[in-house]
């Protein structure tokens, strides 16, 4: 069976989409190819790397990437993680399903916000898996 493709998108591909890619690979990796991208590329936030390391997921080798049109158009599901990405998501072909899962941006906030958003993303992906 071929794996489906899920593409997580946020503004800068720095925090939320990076954590979603890490969780997605861990939770959905048997059934889904998991990618992330951004409307812009801001670099992976070191606190996002640390937050995921705290739960045993290494995203230190991730890179911050602009949305890849090839991945976007070949995805089965595109998930926007912030309102900016939701509003500015490129037009998708009819074959690509899009969902919006909004999460607060932890960038520039206290450590506890990174942990909270990380855990909320995990819960959303676990919930998605059981649909």
Swiss-Prot record:
Major enzyme class: oxidoreductase
Q: What the protein does?
A: Catalyzes the reduction of arsenate [As(V)] to arsenite [As(III)].
This protein's gene is called arsC2
Q: What is this protein called?
A: Arsenate reductase 2
Reaction catalysed? Answer: arsenate + [thioredoxin]-dithiol + H(+) = arsenite + [thioredoxin]-disulfide + H2O
State one molecular function term (GO): protein tyrosine phosphatase activity
- Known EC number: 1.20.4.4
**Positions of disulphide bridges:** 10-82, 82-89
In terms of Pfam families, this protein maps to: LMWPc
Record's SMART domains? LMWPc (SM00226)
Q: Which InterPro entries does this one have? A: Arsenate_reductase_ArsC, Ptyr_pPase, Ptyr_pPase_sf
Q: Which family does it belong to?
A: Belongs to the low molecular weight phosphotyrosine protein phosphatase family. Thioredoxin-coupled ArsC subfamily.
Q: In the UniProt record, which is one GO cellular component term?
A: cytoplasm
Q: Where is the protein localized?
A: Cytoplasm
The biological process GO terms on file are: response to arsenic-containing substance
Q: Name the catalytic site residues.
A: 10 (nucleophile), 82 (nucleophile), 89 (nucleophile)
Check the record and name the CDD domains matching this protein: LMWP_ArsC
- Keyword annotations of the record: Arsenical resistance, Cytoplasm, Disulfide bond, Oxidoreductase, Redox-active center
């Amino acid at each position: 069976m071929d794996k489906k493709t899920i593409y997580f998108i946020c503004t800068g591909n720095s925090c939320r989409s990076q954590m979603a890619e890490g969780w997605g690979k861990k939770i959905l990796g048997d059934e889904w190819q998991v990618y992330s991208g951004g409307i812009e590329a801001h670099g992976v936030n070191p606190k996002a790397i640390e937050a995921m390391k705290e739960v045993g997921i290494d995203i230190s080798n991730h890179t911050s990437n602009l949305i890849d049109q090839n991945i976007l158009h070949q995805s089965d599901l595109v998930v926007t993680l912030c309102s900016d990405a939701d509003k500015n998501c490129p037009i998708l072909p009819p074959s690509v399903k899009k969902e919006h899962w909004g999460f607060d941006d932890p960038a520039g906030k206290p450590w506890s916000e990174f942990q909270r958003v990380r855990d909320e993303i995990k819960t959303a992906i676990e919930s998605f898996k059981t649909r």
